Amino acid sequence: MSIDGQTDSRMPRYSFAGDPVTYVVPTLIDLDELGFRLARAARASGIPLETTVVISNGALPYSTSVHNHLGNDGKIITIGMSYYDFDRVRQRAEVVQDLSDEVVGKAVFLLDEVVDRGGTMPVAIDHILTSGARSVHTGALIFKRRSVFVPDFVGESIDDEWVVFPHDIRPSIERISSKWRDLGVNEAEIRTRFHRLFERAPHLVEQVIHYHSLVPA
């Protein structure tokens, strides 16, 4: 069961001249709302809910909220997944940090902040089941429709858009700044674009401008 097809998104899309990418910038309020939607659907489905496992690092900032909305007991368990081996991209995701606690006999709810291409969760599910879990159900705050894997529960589905998460400001700004400069966008226009991107989260503007200023011209 998923809650795909939501039409009441509060997250506007942003596009800019000369840049083919569409950006989505969820606020902390948006993400808490998506976590609540996801958890409410999971609880209503009647699946067994006992233990939350979160894929680190991306989902960690939102895991406590979802864990509490689910009504799961005990501490949150983490598992580290990655496609990267230093500067080399692996063919498939691998477990790079084992489960932080035992899951033997547990009904696990596996959480990630975004499912993009869908290669991470299946590997994590296999590892959790091999580690003795009784069952695994999955949830993602944001799901990209291009993914080959569909989680059981989804906060919101989007197209192939660049999601800038609040926890990911520095690396996102560094990449976007470099990209826009390479496209020939002047500094004044870059600042204007960033102000537009983060108009719904004005407390982040100072961070954005600071990190942009650190990117070599």
Which ranges hold each PLM region?
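PRPP-associated nucleotide enzymes
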Residues: 1-217
